[in-house]
């Protein structure tokens, strides 16, 4: 049990750092009127989650590895709380276009990404 807990913690540490670096990179190269960094991190993370679980279900990956990658790394890499906060800011500023666009893009593109990732090893 302690090994699994440490795996989740280490994976989370790496996932959070990766999210910060990836999101910051995309926010620097794409204009700031929309939270593209968060959107792209969520799409990438969703794709990787689908890819990993498709592979894991076909290859029988050990629980330690599942904990490290899915519960640890990928859960820390994607960010629903930031997505929610950015939507709150859009609502508070009356920017309903970006509010709805952000929700629609995150839900549809992340669902599509996890599905595509899953199909790769199916």
Swiss-Prot record:
PANTHER family: FLUORIDE EXPORT PROTEIN 1-RELATED
GO biological process, one term: cellular detoxification of fluoride
Subcellular location: Cell inner membrane
Annotated function: Fluoride-specific ion channel. Important for reducing fluoride concentration in the cell, thus reducing its toxicity.
Record membrane topology: Multi-pass membrane protein
HAMAP family: FluC
Family: Belongs to the fluoride channel Fluc/FEX (TC 1.A.43) family.
Catalytic activity field: fluoride(in) = fluoride(out)
Bilayer-spanning residue ranges: 1-21, 34-54, 60-80, 100-120
Record lineage: Bacteria, Pseudomonadati, Campylobacterota, Epsilonproteobacteria, Campylobacterales
NCBIfam families membership: crcB
Chief subcellular location: membrane
GO molecular function, a single term: fluoride channel activity
UniProt-recorded name of the protein: Fluoride-specific ion channel FluC
Keyword Ribonucleoprotein: no
InterPro entries on file: FluC (IPR003691)
A Pfam family recorded for this sequence: CRCB
One GO term describing the cellular component: plasma membrane
Keywords: Cell inner membrane, Cell membrane, Ion channel, Ion transport, Membrane, Transmembrane, Transmembrane helix, Transport
